[in-house]
UniProtKB/Swiss-Prot annotation:
Upper taxonomic lineage: Eukaryota, Metazoa, Chordata, Craniata, Vertebrata
Reactions the enzyme catalyzes: a 1,2-diacyl-sn-glycero-3-phosphocholine + H2O = a 1-acyl-sn-glycero-3-phosphocholine + a fatty acid + H(+)
Entry protein name: Basic phospholipase A2 Cdr-12
Cellular component GO terms, alphabetical: extracellular region
One BP term from GO: phospholipid metabolic process
Its job: Snake venom phospholipase A2 (PLA2) that induces myonecrosis and edema upon intramuscular injections in mice. In vitro, causes a potent blockade of neuromuscular transmission in young chicken biventer cervicis preparation and produces cytotoxicity in murine C2C12 skeletal muscle myotubes and lack cytolytic activity upon myoblasts in vitro. PLA2 catalyzes the calcium-dependent hydrolysis of the 2-acyl groups in 3-sn-phosphoglycerides.
PROSITE patterns found in the cross-reference section: PA2_ASP, PA2_HIS
Disulphide connectivity of cysteines: C26-C115, C28-C44, C43-C95, C49-C122, C50-C88, C57-C81, C75-C86
Enzyme Commission code: 3.1.1.4
Cofactor(s) named in the record: Ca(2+)
Positions bound to Ca(2+): Y27, G29, G31, D48
Sequence similarity: Belongs to the phospholipase A2 family. Group II subfamily. D49 sub-subfamily.
Length: 122
């Protein structure tokens, strides 16, 4: 669920997802278009593509089980959808952590009107 994804992001990056990632670049937050602006934005398009493969799942609201072991998230047992959603979120949160050094505050609230290049495909 988005609530759980927010918790993963906060743990991995020490940043609250809403102000720091909800409107970042061309792909973080709802939807996306154009080319990713940087590594952080690329994490978001990969997450969008991951969710896109789960069209039959309720990706935004389906709760899943996960735990934290030795500083890493581990997805738990559940339905196929729950496990896949958890993996999408886990991989994206870890990607955002790896991208922290290139995070640009100028992309934090980025207007969609600046995302007009041809969109990348999954």
């Amino acid at each position: 669920s988005l609530l759980q994804f927010n918790k993963m992001i906060k743990f991995e990056t020490r940043k609250n997802a809403i102000p720091f990632y909800a409107f970042y670049g061309c792909y973080c937050g709802w939807g996306g278009q154009g080319r990713p602006k940087d590594a952080t934005d690329r994490c978001c398009i990969v997450h969008d593509c991951c969710y896109g493969k789960l069209a039959k799942c309720n990706t935004k609201w389906d709760f899943y089980r996960y735990s934290l072991r030795s500083g890493y998230f581990q997805c738990g047992k559940g339905t196929w959808c729950e496990q896949q959603i958890c993996e999408c979120d886990r991989v994206a949160a870890e990607c955002l952590r790896r991208s922290l050094s290139t995070y640009r505050y100028g992309y934090m609230i980025y207007p969609d009107s600046r995302c007009r290049e041809p969109s990348e495909t999954c």
